[in-house]
Every structure is written in structure tokens, then in C-alpha cells.
Amino acid sequence: MPTPNISTSAAKGFRRAVSELDSKQAEAIMSPRFIGRRQSLIEDARKEREAAAAATDAAESTETIVFEEKDGRAMLNLFFMLKGVKTSPLSRALKVFETFEAKIHHLETRLSRKPREGTAELEYFVRCEVHSSDLNTFISSIKRVAEDVRTTKEDKFHWFPRKICELDKCHHLVTKFDPDLDLDHPGYSDQVYRQRRKSIAEIAFHYKHGDPIPRVEYTAEETATWKEVYSTLKSLYPTHACKEYLEAFNLLEKFCGYNENNIPQLEEVSRFLKERTGFQLRPVRGLLSARDFLASLAFRVFQCTQYIRHASSPMHSPEPDCCHELLGHVPMLADKTFAQFSQDIGLASLGATDEEIEKLATLYWFTVEFGLCRQNGIVKAYGAGLLSSYGELIHSLSDEPEVRDFDPDAAAVQPCQDQPYQPVYFVSESFSDAKNKLRNYAAHIKRPFSVKYEPYTHSIELLDSPQTICHSLESVRDELHTLINALNVIS
């Protein structure tokens, strides 16, 4: 990876931040190997959105209204209001369906969203199937006998997993940082490393939900790389990491084999997390697409790599590796409030547009990856990208970068600069405060439904009708009943 350009003033400011370190450490931090990971999740989300927008612009108008198409017939959702009071508008509308041999799968009436003054009008929702070749003419004919005709274009949303086992389908990788393809990857010219990384990635390729995560027998060289990363970062944690991270890190050392001479196994760490917060790990071959990665968080599943960075660059990896995952992400996922915050980002992503996915990926970047928090008046780090990068961890708490109060609306559109380090970070007053702000932000994401995670069945419940909402309220009443009884017992 080429040495990044650092301005004279920035270099001086950064050297002030490391003035208390010995010369060897200071020299090491200024080297390119201490530069953090690239903004791959955000770049991926942006490219996904741009590609989808380009495809939409190039498509015919009929393609934007089709719910699905098969064997020459198109399925679509149709919304409309009917004209006239003296004639029979419904019979005229049905005549259009009959003329075009439309097969009606579902028909219902709703109170109109745009009632005329003094009247409560009905809106019709029809899910129907018509010949693809007749689609434009069919829509035009409906518009002649109905008002406010709308199609599925407004309500279309991306597929997302509804059951935890469907995460087996969320395997879309971003390969641009793969050592086989990235010329700047430290392992690009090392055939032995590339083959080793590929063999470890095969574990994730064959993994299915419910399987125990296979062990990896790490080599002496891999363990030596881990040791350098572990010991170097651990020296900073007492003064730079938030208290939630420190508490979890101590427990991981006690129960999960975290130490400088041992790379923890994902299965053991996953069991630990599940007992603490319900999160579990799942092996992944590499960098997932933003949509698939965020969807996993909705189920309290964290997609985790098992391979380790190249030995020539122990303090830098252009892609996520087990050092980043185990030292950066895992300790924070052991905190209940932070775990809920992470899941909320995932839930907000389900069915979201490509534009919203890009914003959520940026929010993830400035919180889960590079977030700061204020504890007892002192700013501490909680982001995984900071806690797994010696150089950026020091930089983030120096006087060099700009630190702003966390505002999801601002963070979601903040440009990212990750070479060499971030110029802007967002600081939260607490994880609870960040969680509440995120939920307010997510409430404004436009979807034709809301979602709720069902922990007993590890599934996503769609709240898209009064019936499903009432059903969900029943479980809330049951929980309230239990809590009221508990209060009565102790009072």
C-alpha cells in the first residue's frame, strides 16, 4: 500500500500526540503499516446504490411497476380510488380486469389516505396477474375509470432474510480487497499466504447455520503476528478504551483464551457472547456486501473472518481479519446496550432502499467502527476500527481531529476519509443516548412496514397490518404482566 500524503501541519499535530512515546514507537506509528482499514462497507453500499440507480434509469417504465414476472405474466400490486356515485364504478373497474384476463390474487378495501372534504372514501388494493405484453394498456385502462392509481413502485422493497437460517443466503462478497486481486494488499505477491487464506476461507464457504464453527490450527507465524498486534494494542487499552470494552476484555482473557500467545477460536467466543447478549458469530469468507452484513446484525449475528493479516504488515489490513474482529468488535458486542444498538442498525436496514443502506453503512462506520463516547467527562474509544488500530486509536484521542456530538442525520452523510486517518469523529454521551437517537432516525426510513425481532424463533416479524401489530402487543402485555407481578412480590 503506498504511503499516504500527510500535510506538514497534520504531521506536526500528530507528532505532538505521540510525543510521550519512545522514538521507536513514534516512528512506527507514522509508518503506513499503522494506517487503519479502508471504508469498504460504505464504498460498497454507494456502488450498490449507484448501480441500482443506473439500472433503473436504463429500464423501461413497465419494469418499475412489476412485482415479479414469470412465464410472460406480470404480478403487480395496484392501488386506486373509484370515480362516480350514481354509476357503478366497481363494476366498470372489474370489467377492465375481465377484458385483460387479469387474475386477481387479493382484493381489499381501505380508508383512503386522501379523503375528499367531508367524505370517508375507500381505496382499493388489488394484487393481480396480467399478461406482460398488456401491462401498459391495462394500467391506462384502469386510470380511465379510477383515480389516484398507484403501483408497487412505491411499495417495492429488497428481499431480506426472515429466518436466521436464511443468513445462509447472505453471502455476497466484495472481492476488491482480496489478496488475489488487490495489488496493494500486503499478501498479493505471497503465494503461500494467498493459498493459506483461501483454505481458511473454505470453512466459511461450507458453513451452514446451526453447525459448530470449525477450529483453525494457526501456524507459528500467524500466532507471532497476533502476538505483536495483541501486545501493542493492549498497552493502550487502559487509557484509551471505554469501560465497557475493558470489562469485556478482562472476561475474554479469563474465559475465552484471549492472550498474546493464542488466537481465540470463534466457536468458544460465540458461546461466550450468546450467554452475555444473545449475539453469536458466524464465519465469513471475506468482506460482505453492506446489505448482507447489516441484515445479519438484525438477528444478532456478527459475520466474522478467521484468517489473519499478512506477517509483513501486522498493524494494517486492507480487509477485515480476525485481529480486527476479535480485538475490535467482540468485546463491545458483549455489552447489552451496545449489542442492542448494533441490532437496531441491522433492523433498520431490512428492506431499505440502496440510498438508505449507504446512509446506514456510514452511520455504522462513524459509530461501531470509529465511534467515541464521553465517560466521566473524558472521551474514550469504543469503535472497532479504533480499538484494532494502534495509530488511529492514538490519533482519535489527540487534539488533531475534529470531534462532534453524535447526530445520526449528520453522521449518515458525513464524508469519510480513511487515508491516513479520520479528520472527524462523533462522540456519544452514552450508548443509551446513541441507541435512542438511532431509533428516532430509523423511524423516518420509508418502508411499507415495520419489523420486530422474535427472539424465541430467531425470526423477523413484519408489522404491516393491524392484525400483526395486535398480535405483537399480546407478547408485550404478557411481559408487562410478569413485571407487575414481580413488583408486587418485592413491594
Swiss-Prot record:
Localisation: Cytoplasm, Perinuclear region; Cell projection, Axon
Primary localisation category: cytoplasm
Pathway in which this enzyme or protein is active: Catecholamine biosynthesis; dopamine biosynthesis; dopamine from L-tyrosine: step 1/2
Annotated residues for binding of Fe cation: 324, 329, 369
InterPro entries to which the protein is assigned, alphabetical: ACT-like_dom_sf (IPR045865), ArAA_hydroxylase (IPR001273), ArAA_hydroxylase_Fe/CU_BS (IPR018301), ArAA_hydroxylase_sf (IPR036951), Aro-AA_hydroxylase_C_sf (IPR036329), Aromatic-AA_hydroxylase_C (IPR019774), Eu_TyrOH_cat (IPR041903), TH_ACT (IPR049321)
Top-tier EC class: oxidoreductase
EC number: 1.14.16.2
GO MF annotation terms: iron ion binding; tyrosine 3-monooxygenase activity
Pfam families reported in the protein's UniProt record: Biopterin_H (PF00351), TH_ACT (PF21417), TOH_N (PF12549)
GO CC terms: axon; cytoplasm; perikaryon; perinuclear region of cytoplasm
Reaction catalyzed: (6R)-L-erythro-5,6,7,8-tetrahydrobiopterin + L-tyrosine + O2 = (4aS,6R)-4a-hydroxy-L-erythro-5,6,7,8-tetrahydrobiopterin + L-dopa
The keyword Oxidoreductase belongs to this UniProt entry's keyword annotation: yes
Residues found modified as Phosphoserine: 19, 31, 40
Record keywords: Catecholamine biosynthesis, Cell projection, Cytoplasm, Iron, Metal-binding, Monooxygenase, Neurotransmitter biosynthesis, Oxidoreductase, Phosphoprotein
Means of activity regulation: Phosphorylation leads to an increase in the catalytic activity.
Database matches in NCBIfam families: Tyr_3_monoox
General function of this protein: Plays an important role in the physiology of adrenergic neurons.
PANTHER family with a match to the protein in the record: AROMATIC AMINO ACID HYDROXYLASE, TYROSINE 3-MONOOXYGENASE
Family label: Belongs to the biopterin-dependent aromatic amino acid hydroxylase family.
Protein name: Tyrosine 3-monooxygenase
Organism, as annotated: Phasianidae sp.
Gene: TH
